[in-house]
Design a protein with these regions (language model features):
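Single conserved hydrophobic/aromatic residue that forms the stacking wall/gate
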Residues: 1-12, 238-239
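Residue-level preference for short coil/turn positions at secondary-structure junctions
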Residues: 6, 22, 138, 198-199
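Short, hinge-like loop/turn segments at secondary-structure boundaries
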Residues: 8-9, 67-68, 186-188
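Short loop segments at secondary-structure junctions
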Residues: 13, 119, 208-210
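FAD-binding subdomain of flavoenzyme oxidoreductases
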Residues: 15-169
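Ser/Thr-glycine-rich phosphate-binding loops at phosphate-binding pockets of nucleotides
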Residues: 33, 239-240
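C-terminal substrate-recognition/cap domain of FAD-linked oxidoreductases
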Residues: 130-134, 140-238
Length: 240
């Protein structure tokens, strides 16, 4: 639906327009800081899963314009996957009103997906209706040392099979990269000593569980134990 844009200027605001716990959606303006959206969802007992290092300063509009991925993309997808509807100012100075919380919409062209990731070249996103999810009851995280990328791929395959949808994070980092961080920022240090600190590859593995802390721990330890026995992982540092 197109309607004329009234006024000669557009101001992108930062309000939360609506939060629907029945449909698990939140409608926010593009100037909203990502962290503020996360907190609004948390206050309603829900999770908005997009998370990245700049979440205290980046805006939802920027996340949408770049189709940001974040740390939990394995489970929840990119920003495009988290979006149900948009409000956009077009190049003609009109507002395209596609702010809908409809889960299944197979009518016509999907302009929403064209605008997301276009970095403002097709229009300026001014608001969005986003998906919310149940908050996890417990989570487990481990930093692992590995000898090769092949081992990392096999570990990821085992984690997917063992955790299913509960696998929320898997980040692979080279040892050279982490050593460079330590050199440039002497106040930082690796959590491993000796030969383990010189490992060629590190992986960060995360599980989020909807049942209980005990259930999360058991699943996590089972998959990780099997990976260690198979020689995929050399050393692990676990936080539960």
């Amino acid at each position: 639906m197109l309607r004329s844009l009234v006024g000669s200027e557009m101001c992108i605001r930062d309000r939360v327009r609506a939060l629907d716990t029945d449909n698990d959606t939140i409608t926010v303006e593009a100037g909203c800081i990502l962290q503020a959206v996360q907190e609004a969802a948390a206050n309603a007992g829900r999770l908005f899963p997009l998370s990245l290092a700049a979440e205290g300063s980046c805006t939802i509009g920027g996340n949408l314009a770049t189709n940001a991925g974040g740390t939990q993309v394995l489970r929840y997808g990119n920003t495009r996957d988290l979006t149900l509807g948009l409000e956009v100012v077009t190049a003609e100075g009109e507002i395209w009103d596609g702010l809908r919380g409809l889960r299944k919409d197979n009518t016509g062209y999907d302009l929403r997906d064209l605008y997301i990731g276009s970095e403002g070249t097709l229009g300026i996103i001014t608001a969005a209706t986003l998906k919310l999810f149940p908050r996890p009851v417990a989570s487990c995280t481990a930093l692992l040392t590995l000898d090769s990328i092949d081992n990392a791929v096999e570990l990821l395959s085992r984690a997917r099979a063992g955790f299913g949808a509960a696998l929320t994070g898997f980040e692979l980092m080279s040892g050279d990269c982490l050593q460079a961080v330590v050199r440039l920022f002497p106040q930082q240090r690796l959590p491993f000593d000796g030969e383990s600190a010189a490992s060629p590859w590190f992986a960060l593995l995360e599980l989020s569980d909807s049942e209980s802390e005990t259930h999360a721990r058991e699943r996590f330890e089972t998959v990780l134990g099997d990976a260690i026995e198979a020689g995929l992982v050399n050393l692990s540092l676990i936080h539960i």
